[in-house]
Amino acid sequence: MANFTFGDLALDVARMGGLASTPSGLRSTGLTTPGLSPTGLVTSDFNDSYGLTGQFINGSHSSRSRDNASANDTSATNMTDDRYWSLTVYSHEHLVLTSVILGLFVLCCIIGNCFVIAAVMLERSLHNVANYLILSLAVADLMVAVLVMPLSVVSEISKVWFLHSEVCDMWISVDVLCCTASILHLVAIAMDRYWAVTSIDYIRRRSARRILLMIMVVWIVALFISIPPLFGWRDPNNDPDKTGTCIISQDKGYTIFSTVGAFYLPMLVMMIIYIRIWLVARSRIRKDKFQMTKARLKTEETTLVASPKTEYSVVSDCNGCNSPDSTTEKKKRRAPFKSYGCSPRPERKKNRAKKLPENANGVNSNSSSSERLKQIQIETAEAFANGCAEEASIAMLERQCNNGKKISSNDTPYSRTREKLELKRERKAARTLAIITGAFLICWLPFFIIALIGPFVDPEGIPPFARSFVLWLGYFNSLLNPIIYTIFSPEFRSAFQKILFGKYRRGHR
């Protein structure tokens, strides 16, 4: 503040550095600190998030009057103009470690989002309207890292807001603006993906104008949520010049408005959209699988006839499916087809498959079914011994037994591979959506729970460490976004590799 003395600031710095934690330590620095009573030294941690005054020893309090009032003036009438100071005395190692960790965090966030922006601008394959949303998201997260996080680091280390209240108001508004814009961009991306999945014509109709309109709406809504405290919608008791802390407005009405608009409503929309995307993707994958199976069955019917008047049969023996007391039943399946000019040997009118060996349970094994399939293919091929190019192939044999069981020998390597691929696609879609929604909820849900209940509960019930942790956990989402929304794209991965190895040169893109 403008009325700080050098001794005041030196005292704060000394306490932060662990140089002076007792009155004797202060005297050893040779600094005089007007307005500080030795018996009124603060001993408790500073409640950095909500401006709580510390506890005082010997029953007296220390104060710095903004109008340079006398140090002996401790009357209650001046307490509203006093600024209470209470700094947690950390060791030098603790401060250095905290500074390094948070500094690296901010640096990684800046680098990650700069990579995304550079990739979209430099890589030709990424020059499409769908990536405009990714680009705008990276800009919002970069603003969080550049404009918001550095002051958060300073506040986290010092535990005191040293700047003017006007700077605090602007910083809080920018914080809410950028974080809200980042969250709303995730909703816009989810909507774009949902329309692309459910609407056949959306990809064709998705123009730059449409995407830019979505981006504009995102920033306007974020601005609408962030600026009300600048126009008076705030808690009048939350003055940084009095409390020594800079926090978002604790007005109950604004708290509900901002948390619902910035998180809870977007979260609900995202959850609904991604659940529907997953259902549509799963339905489409299974539908494609069914259509492929149906088409394959049509082309792989058991058909062994060389001319319209000549028929061949495949006999399927069901002895193995019945219990030992059951009667043996044989069923024949006939399916005529044309011979394409071939004449089979008259003596091969009927082709009978040999009975399959049975396992201990009386049911034929899969390996036996495969052997039987090969045997029938050989026999039917021999039926065209006059040199016909068409080779009959039996790819599907079913045995319907008395007990209602159906055994299929359609266990070819091709079908197994296709089933594995379809299952892999479905699992990948579910995993991708789970990562996106899970990261969003893990990062932001704890912060907004505390932010919503904060004005309605006793502030002492929420530890300052918990407030700091959930705040930086929310900031962590700005570091994860450039990873989550690009790592699944081969184009982005290729662009990142080119950037890392300096393959982008002037005139070569």
Swiss-Prot record:
Residue ranges annotated as Extracellular topological domain: 1-99, 155-169, 234-259, 457-465
PANTHER family: 5-HYDROXYTRYPTAMINE RECEPTOR 1B-LIKE ISOFORM X1 (PTHR24248:SF200), ADRENERGIC RECEPTOR-RELATED G-PROTEIN COUPLED RECEPTOR (PTHR24248)
Pfam families per record: 7tm_1
Membrane-spanning residues: 100-122, 133-154, 170-191, 211-233, 260-281, 433-456, 466-488
Compartments where located: Cell membrane
Gene3D superfamilies tied to this protein: Rhodopsin 7-helix transmembrane proteins
Family: Belongs to the G-protein coupled receptor 1 family.
Gene Ontology biological process terms in this record: adenylate cyclase-activating adrenergic receptor signaling pathway; positive regulation of MAPK cascade
Family matches, as SUPFAM superfamilies: Family A G protein-coupled receptor-like
Lipid bilayer topology: Multi-pass membrane protein
Region of interest called Disordered, as start-end residue ranges on this chain: 323-372
Cytoplasmic side stretches: 123-132, 192-210, 282-432, 489-509
CDD domains: 7tmA_5-HT1A_invertebrates
Example GO molecular function: G protein-coupled receptor activity
Organism expressing this protein natively: Lymnaea stagnalis (Great pond snail)
Primary location recorded for the protein, binned into one broad class: membrane
Glycosylation sites: N3, N47, N58, N68, N72, N78
Database matches in SMART domains: 7TM_GPCR_Srsx
Record-annotated disulphide pairs: C168-C246
GO CC term (a single one): plasma membrane
Annotated protein name in UniProt: 5-hydroxytryptamine receptor
This protein's UniProt keywords: Cell membrane, Disulfide bond, G-protein coupled receptor, Glycoprotein, Membrane, Receptor, Transducer, Transmembrane, Transmembrane helix
Annotated function: This is a receptor for 5-hydroxytryptamine (serotonin), a biogenic hormone that function as a neurotransmitter, a hormone, and a mitogen.
